[in-house]
Amino acid sequence: MTSHSPKLTPMFEQYMNIKAEYPDALLFYRMGDFYELFFEDAEVAARELQIALTCRNPNAENKVPMCGVPHHSARSYISQLVDKGYKVAICEQMEDPREAKGLVKRGVIRVLTSGTALEDENLSPKAHTYLGALCWDKSEGAGGFAWVDFSTGEWSGLQSRKEQELWQWVQKMAPRELLLADTLTPPASLELTETQFSKVPERAYFDYKRSAEKIMSAQQVAELGALGLENRKELVRACGALLTYLSQTQKQDLNHLCQFKPLNLNRHLLLDEITERNLELFRRLDGRKGKGTLWHVLDHTVTPMGGRLLQERLKHPWREQAPIDETQEAVSHFFAHNTLRRQLREALDTVYDIERLSTRIFLNRATPRDYVALRQSLKALPAVRELLEAPQTGDGRYATPEEQLGAALPPFLHRMLKSWDDLADYHDLLEKALVDNPPHVITEGGLFRQGFHPALDELMDLSEHGASKLHDLLAEVQQTTGISKIKLGNNRVFGYYFEVPKSVSEELPDTFVRRQTLANAERYTSERLKELEEKLFSAADKRKTMELKLFQQLREHVAQARPRVLFMADLLATLDHWQGLAEAARHWNWVRPVLHDGQDIVIREGRHPVVEAVQGPAGFIPNDLRIDDQRRLLLITGPNMAGKSTVLRQAAIICILAQIGSFVPAREARIGLCDRIFSRVGASDNLAQGQSTFMVEMMETARILRQATRRSLVILDEIGRGTSTFDGLALAWAVVEELMKKQQAGIRTLFATHYHELTSLEGTIPGVHNMNIAIKEWGGEIVFLRRLVPGPSDRSYGVEVAKLAGVPQNVVQRARQILELLEQKSKADGTRRPASYHEAQPLLPGMPEPPSTASAEPPQTVTPPEPPVLTALRDLDTDNLTPLEALTVLTEWKTLWGAGKNEC
């Protein structure tokens, strides 16, 4: 609205005042049975929702764009907007319009954002939806990153002195919404296409003192140390920002949040986002989810909670032996007992997402159907318990009575059943209270069963059987008066009445009161008719009012069960996770691996689970692999398409599966526990940030060399490509040396390369061992055997692969001629490859000859003085150079060099 706009009506003045408080949100403004949007909000909503855009005051000079949606169907429209990244502020009528004096009071009751969604329409069932907050204090040289799944109440975080590490965790956790101080800018290299960034005032959101107070209040603790937050100032600030944002958007207490647990990196195998992407754990290399990922092969869970737990385990595998052993024991049990596993899957399949259901109930955001879903889920608890309690035999059968005498439950089941809670009291309450198919909206009524509440029963009887009660009263009057011609009627003026012909009207008792005289009839009422009429007219309203009151009481009672519900949700998720791993192992014919504290990794007939799932078992060639003290770095050579990358990836995936407690795709596996797995596989240009494949490769390699330890597993594929042959060879050589020098005995590494010169490192550098992917030549063609065998590959077969790829025959033939000439030349000169363009050029007819120097005098050899800029570069202390100082030095050099001055 501009300054010269006409005076606002009271309603628009109210709207504008509320809108001013939420300028970045679409304001859904309740007016009667509709939510209305005005001005720019209306234009955006109409465009995104494909609904009609109209205008208020169409005949006025200043028309107001508007659109609206019915309140009973607004949820789907709002969900669409939230999915598109919009914030939506819900402005409700805060009083009954019929009782309002003047303008109805209105206020925003909630702001919906992509990171605070509670509705199923905005949530992925088997994935967490995170709201994140990141802060970085340059003066302290430290920062914090915290995240919360508001739909379940789980939250965690970490603190680091490396800003890059924090952003790596942001990429790994991939929050739907990320809170950043308005002074902080994300790095240009950050790839988060599905994350919405929300800038907030640093002082209001990230203040340490306020954050500490909010955390202790929300978690009901007296000190931060109770949550593991002592001496973690930056993590406290990040957590405080989350709580501030949630309080402002949700407009209520945050008592549903679980106890905060800082992420303990020492307990988990660390997989950064780059490794997740290269190994295609959750997404394919093209960014798509589903088929072609490890998740698609592994996920056999049947509940949303079990699916989310599997995702969490796959993102954070265990590094400790104890939880791995317990998971393996459970998976082995369900793997061996097929009948139990099948029946358990059937029982769990009736369980809804009780984690998220309990959150919606606790926050008063649940619909009646959510309560019915909770009831249905609680009904499954005794059935699941009985399945687990039934003794099993070793061959997968239920034990006979005689066999049960010596049968004992596995320790993991005994511990679980000891704390089992059927929640029978809450199931029985919900069963007694709610009908089987209640309406979606509370205000529609018809929620409760007959017999739940006596007063409600009477109102239900009146509202549902009013017509029959009127008919019964009429029959009774006809019988007692003996006048069969009495009729029952109704109109807006007099309501219900008895109509009697004038000829018999005098026969009516005095208890009947005349209401209206017609030409041939008289209309009467009676005390009983008036009483019944009053009850009928008010029954529907009274029933809705009473149902609302009873429903609120039911909500408060069920909300108290949240801790018990969450405890059982965790048990059910764990059961589902275990049986899902067992189902996957049965389906794909996997085996139980042996994990140990040593360094050896021994895999017999290992398979890549995703490739095998696509090709089928018959089409996949398994491979053996061994890493030990004498074979720390396997140098794998062979042509493209032979399967080097598959061997690398499958080794890493088998280690990851083993450390979540899963069976693995192999005939046998012994895995020395890993602390980190690094993967540098595949080309990954980052053109948007001006980073070539080679630059990205070098950055990832540098990170690996800095962070890998003796307990890490590193897989590297084609290090050094993307630059000149000898540059690439030199870099690959140096990387191998560095990997074997680090951590005394070297880092466990699988190193695939086309640089055959590197094969000479076996015997030169302890721990380097040559392997190759076998090839067979047959009738001038090559056959990929897909077998990993000892020794180096004899050559790269690049021309043969080009032929298989469909390169035109004339190009292939010419390539063979050139290759033969190059090889002859290199043998004659005693070198592996031509050392320069001048050596290679005469072998390539059609290329211009280099300038002739035969008749020229031999050039005088003069050593020029070292340029001052090179001297300055050598003297530069890069370890202690600040970014500002570096920029200043570069500017000075550019000024000198750009001017063409000889002195530089």
Curated annotation (Swiss-Prot):
Molecular function terms, GO-annotated: ATP binding; ATP-dependent DNA damage sensor activity; damaged DNA binding; mismatched DNA binding
What superkingdom does the record give?
A: Bacteria
Gene3D superfamilies in the record: 1.10.1420.10, DNA repair protein MutS, domain I, MutS, connector domain, P-loop containing nucleotide triphosphate hydrolases
PROSITE patterns cross-referenced by the UniProt entry: DNA_MISMATCH_REPAIR_2 (PS00486)
Name the InterPro entries on file. DNA_mismatch_repair_MutS, DNA_mismatch_repair_MutS-lik_N, DNA_mismatch_repair_MutS/MSH, DNA_mismatch_repair_MutS_C, DNA_mismatch_repair_MutS_clamp, DNA_mismatch_repair_MutS_core, DNA_mismatch_repair_MutS_N, DNA_mismatch_repair_MutS_sf
SMART domains, from UniProt? Answer: MUTSac, MUTSd
One annotated GO biological process? mismatch repair
Q: Name the residues that bind ATP.
A: G638, P639, N640, M641, A642, G643, K644, S645
Which family would the database say this protein is a member of? Answer: Belongs to the DNA mismatch repair MutS family.
Q: What does this protein do?
A: This protein is involved in the repair of mismatches in DNA. It is possible that it carries out the mismatch recognition step. This protein has a weak ATPase activity.
Q: Which PANTHER family match?
A: DNA MISMATCH REPAIR PROTEIN MSH1, MITOCHONDRIAL, DNA MISMATCH REPAIR PROTEIN MUTS FAMILY MEMBER
Q: What is the official name of this protein in its record? A: DNA mismatch repair protein MutS
Source organism per entry reads Oleidesulfovibrio alaskensis (strain ATCC BAA-1058 / DSM 17464 / G20)
